[in-house]
Every structure is written in C-alpha cells, then in structure tokens.
C-alpha cells in the first residue's frame, strides 16, 4: 500500500518527467526487450530493432498509462481497469513481464534523473510500479 509519503514522492518525481513519459516508456520497453528477450514473444508483429517506431509508439502507451496511474493514486484499480482487462483477457501477457518492464522503467528513470532519484524516491517509485503491476494482473485470477 502506498503511504502518503510514497504518493508525495511519486507525484513530485513525475513532475520532473514532464512531457517525457512516452519517450521514457519507449526506452524502458526497448531496454526490456534487450535485457529479457523472452518478452519479445508478445510482439511478433513489431519491428523490435533499436529506435523502432512501433516500440516507441507502444512505449508511449506505457508512459501514458503510468501518467494516468500517477493521477489516480487513490484509485488505481478503477483507473487501470480497462488495461487490466486488456492484458489479462485479450493479450494474455504473462504477469512476470510486468515486473521485468517495471524494473526497466526504474532504471530508465534513474538514468534520466539521477539527482532526484534518491533512495526514498526509489523505494516509493518501486512500490508504485509494483502496485500498478499488481492491479494490471489482478484480473488474471
């Protein structure tokens, strides 16, 4: 459960991202594909080469979803319900992949904002991304 301090850290950090959430999402997705090649199996129709327009476009969706989640920290299940349905029932993404992508999101954020990525912020962002992953996989059960 995200504490008030966690929510404050996440919101404050997200303001530093500005309009780069989509760009960072694309970078995190590319990093996921490179670091965890088995994640590519869900994208057989994509050009997965570095800098691919398809990876960038899907990464923007990831960034936009995280931005949506930041705006609804008190109701993540409600805000992410449609995405949860999509990933559980239509796309059938293995839940472990959310953890892998979440790790790559954290790495990407830390690389772009090292001064703001303090241990406390890191812990809060990790809890946030874990909570988002839990919500997205909640309809698998």
Swiss-Prot record:
Q: Which GO terms describe its molecular function?
A: haptoglobin binding; heme binding; iron ion binding; organic acid binding; oxygen binding; oxygen carrier activity; peroxidase activity
Sites binding heme b sit at 87
Cite the record's tissue specificity text. Answer: Red blood cells.
What InterPro entries does the database record attribute to this sequence? Globin, Globin-like_sf, Globin/Proto, Hemoglobin_a-typ, Hemoglobin_oxygen_transport, Hemoglobin_pi
Binding, O2: 58
Q: Which CDD domains match?
A: Hb-alpha-like
- Specify the domain of life of the species encoding this protein: Eukaryota
Task: Say which family it is in.
Answer: Belongs to the globin family.
Query: GO CC terms on record?
Result: blood microparticle; haptoglobin-hemoglobin complex; hemoglobin complex
Residues with the modification Phosphothreonine, per the entry, are 108, 134, 137
Which gene does this sequence derive from?
A: HBA
Q: What is this protein called?
A: Hemoglobin subunit alpha
């Amino acid at each position: 459960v995200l504490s008030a301090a966690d929510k404050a850290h996440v919101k404050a950090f997200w303001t530093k991202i500005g309009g780069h959430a989509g760009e960072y999402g694309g970078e995190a997705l590319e990093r996921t594909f490179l670091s965890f090649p088995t994640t590519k199996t869900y994208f057989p129709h994509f050009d997965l080469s570095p800098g691919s327009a398809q990876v960038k476009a899907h990464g923007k969706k990831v960034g936009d979803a995280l931005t949506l989640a930041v705006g609804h920290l008190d109701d993540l299940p409600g805000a992410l319900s449609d995405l949860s349905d999509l990933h559980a029932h239509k796309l059938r993404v293995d839940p472990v992949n959310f953890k892998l992508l979440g790790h790559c999101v954290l790495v990407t954020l830390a690389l772009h904002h090292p001064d703001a990525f303090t241990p406390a912020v890191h812990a809060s962002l990790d809890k946030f991304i874990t909570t988002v992953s839990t919500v997205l996989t909640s309809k698998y059960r």
